[in-house]
């Protein structure tokens, strides 16, 4: 009898044990799934964090290892950046960039680029920044920017004897601007005005635009006032700038989105140059006056 009772008790314990094992296996499976999911989430978060840290580390390593500040610029944009008579690249912006590189202990390299390919060059890492009369207005969220260092306006340049005295006189005329320029962007903001033009053309650079104006192929050029004044002076031509401007804007140095470390170093150096009079000196060399805005 006792043996039978023991057997029944043992059978009951085994049933309970099997039930317990089944429950433990299910719980273990569920716990394992939860653990795996949590681990995946953690790995994903760590991966994102590591990616951000990696980008910052790459930027710092590039500055440290490369030791070069590669400045992207339009070589046909005097006086900001162009090729001088000696075959060397020069200009107001390039002199600023060269001085900044010197103070940061970096090798300076001026890299000419096609203006409509500037974003591709920056994203590919072929250049470290765009520094060449680069308008911030309308592009505020597209780059990591320095603080503005110069004010500018978009204007129209016409022949003095053209009979064009205001924007209203551009009706029925051929107007030209540089492709992918701030002038082109500004013109898109005034469709009522551009609708009166006979034609709106674009060209690769402003040297070509001035040749077109000199030859009478176009009636007006829309462009930066800083560059317009310099071009008129250098060409000693009978061109005038219309008094009613197209838009007001500011120049800044544009870096790849997220390149804050290099931007901060360049910005601090520009502020140092403003404080010791270097910005003023370089500006007076190119424009006859101090047109910079940092520290003012």
For each predicted feature, which ranges?
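Short helix-initiation/N-cap motifs at beta->coil->alpha
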Residues: 94, 109-121, 200-215, 249
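Extended ligand-binding regions for polar small-molecule ligands
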Residues: 94-103, 161-164, 173-174, 179-182, ...
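Bacterial lipoprotein signal-peptidase II cleavage site
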Residues: 18-33, 40-48
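Acidic, polar ligand-binding/catalytic clefts
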Residues: 98, 102, 107-169, 240
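A ligand-binding cleft/hinge motif common to bilobed small-molecule-binding domains
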Residues: 117, 133-142, 186-189, 214-215, ...
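Periplasmic-binding protein-like
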Residues: 75, 151-158, 225, 229, ...
């Amino acid at each position: 009898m006792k043996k039978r009772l023991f057997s029944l008790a043992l059978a009951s314990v085994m049933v309970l044990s099997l039930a317990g094992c089944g429950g433990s296996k299910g719980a273990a499976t569920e716990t394992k799934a939860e653990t795996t999911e949590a681990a995946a989430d953690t790995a994903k978060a760590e991966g994102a964090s590591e990616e951000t840290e990696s980008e910052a580390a790459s930027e710092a390593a590039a500055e440290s290892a490369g030791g070069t500040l590669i400045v992207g610029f339009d070589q046909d944009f005097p006086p900001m950046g162009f090729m001088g008579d000696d075959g060397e690249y020069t200009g107001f912006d390039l002199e600023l960039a060269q001085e900044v590189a010197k103070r940061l202990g970096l090798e300076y390299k001026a890299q000419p680029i096609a203006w409509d390919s500037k974003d591709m060059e920056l994203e590919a890492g072929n250049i470290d920044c765009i520094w060449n009369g680069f308008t911030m207005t309308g592009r505020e969220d597209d780059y990591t920017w320095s603080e503005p260092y110069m004010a500018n306006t978009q204007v129209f340049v016409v022949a003095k004897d053209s009979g064009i005295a205001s924007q209203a006189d551009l009706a029925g005329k051929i107007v030209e601007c540089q492709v992918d320029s701030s002038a082109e962007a500004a013109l898109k903001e005034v469709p009522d005005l551009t609708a009166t033009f006979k034609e709106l053309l674009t060209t690769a650079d402003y040297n070509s635009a001035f040749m077109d104006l000199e030859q009478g192929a176009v009636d007006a050029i829309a462009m930066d006032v800083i560059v317009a004044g310099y071009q008129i002076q250098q060409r000693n031509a009978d061109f005038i700038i219309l008094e009613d401007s197209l838009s007001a804007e500011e120049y800044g140095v544009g870096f790849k989105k997220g390149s804050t470390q290099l931007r901060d170093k360049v910005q601090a150096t520009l502020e140092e140059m403003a404080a010791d009079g270097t910005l003023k000196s370089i500006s007076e060399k190119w424009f006859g006056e101090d047109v910079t805005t940092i520290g003012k």
